[in-house]
């Protein structure tokens, strides 16, 4: 299978869609696609049938284009190529299915692949709900206090003509800034966030940030497990459908969102392609996957049972993701609570100390 040709097609056919369908819609679409393929219904009829279903409303603009491409004589993989709803991994697997004459099996395997991916992402999202609510609630309460509560004490403190503690002066300055220049501060924050997003996407900043988050941050271990699960799952499905290791790696590399891993996988591909290292040696050198992952790769190469090992790795690390998520939350929640307690404590102390001084002065 020639990956280079598919990369060129993806670039040429690249287009904009107003929105991107969820992974859930994608695996449900593939599940029905697989059933209809097994029923020997022509592909163009399958696409036309599925695009009219309400549950695939988000996919309809994309499927309209796929239908048009098929009618214009393009192959199945070419018809899906270039659409943001169908990534490089998806179109590469479809091309493999066409070339091998096993499109029905590939589509079924893809439906299971995206279903497992969706399940993992959903678990991560569900685990983040409480920390997000905690953070948002804390920010809203802090802004409310700075805008409405603190100013009521300012007049009292100023009328007492007393020397305020440093913490109180800082608190009053922040409160005044929020009240007087709140809109300007908000605009600056939005510009900073937008600048960071652009820098992440367009410059080396994205690579170094992802490298730090994966190798140096307190949550690096959990992040490494999640990405290792993704790599193992992808290697499993590509090898199961007779794709070479090199072709599988380049597709995984092109589909990888983490910029640090994207570069590391590119280097691994080059080292294996040149014959400089074996698969296990290249991964072990880079240290981007856990040692257990690398050890199982070595066993796979020694025994020739790559398919079985990839499948076991996939199942193992999909399970490890749940423990990684629980570990992540067990660290994050206390950190958030402690941080909020420090902020609240700072505000309380900054208000109560001068309040006692005011009361004493009256006495």
Which residues does each predicted region cover?
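Membrane-interfacial amphipathic helices
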Residues: 1-27, 31-34, 209-223, 291
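General membrane topology signal spanning transmembrane segments
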Residues: 1-5, 163-172, 247-251
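Glycine- and small-hydrophobic-enriched helix-loop-helix hairpins
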Residues: 23-123, 220, 224-328
């Amino acid at each position: 299978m020639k990956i280079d040709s598919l990369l060129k097609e993806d670039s040429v056919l690249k287009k904009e869609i107003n929105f991107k369908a969820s992974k859930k819609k994608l695996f449900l679409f593939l599940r029905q696609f697989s059933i209809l393929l097994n029923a020997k219904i022509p592909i163009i009829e399958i696409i036309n049938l599925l695009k009219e279903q309400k549950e695939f409303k988000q996919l309809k603009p994309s499927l309209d284009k796929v239908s048009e491409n098929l009618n214009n004589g393009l192959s199945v993989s070419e018809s899906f190529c270039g659409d943001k709803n169908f990534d490089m991994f998806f179109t590469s697997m479809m091309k493999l299915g066409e070339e091998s004459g096993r499109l029905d099996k590939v589509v079924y395997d893809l439906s299971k692949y995206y279903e497992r991916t969706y399940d993992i992402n959903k678990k991560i999202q569900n685990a983040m709900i409480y920390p997000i609510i905690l953070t948002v609630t804390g920010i809203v309460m802090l802004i409310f206090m700075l805008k409405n509560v603190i100013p009521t004490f300012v007049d009292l403190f100023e009328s007492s003509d007393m020397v305020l503690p440093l913490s109180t002066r800082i608190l009053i300055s922040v409160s005044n800034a929020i009240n007087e220049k709140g809109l300007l501060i908000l605009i600056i924050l939005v510009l900073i966030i937008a600048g960071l997003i652009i820098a992440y996407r367009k410059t080396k900043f994205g690579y170094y940030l992802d490298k730090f988050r994966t190798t140096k941050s307190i949550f690096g271990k959990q992040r490494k497990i999640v990405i290792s699960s993704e790599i193992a799952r992808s290697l499993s499905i590509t090898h199961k459908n007779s794709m070479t290791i090199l072709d599988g790696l380049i597709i995984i590399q092109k589909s990888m969102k983490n910029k640090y891993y994207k570069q590391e996988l590119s280097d691994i591909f080059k080292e294996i392609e040149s014959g400089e290292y074996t698969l296990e040696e290249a991964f072990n050198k880079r240290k981007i996957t856990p040692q257990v992952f690398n050890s199982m790769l070595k066993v796979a190469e020694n025994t020739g049972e790559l398919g079985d090992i990839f499948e076991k790795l996939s199942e193992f690390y999909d399970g490890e993701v749940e423990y990684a998520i629980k570990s992540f939350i067990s660290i994050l929640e206390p950190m958030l609570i402690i941080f909020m307690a420090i902020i609240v404590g700072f505000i309380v102390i900054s208000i109560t100390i001068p309040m006692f001084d005011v009361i004493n002065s009256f006495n």
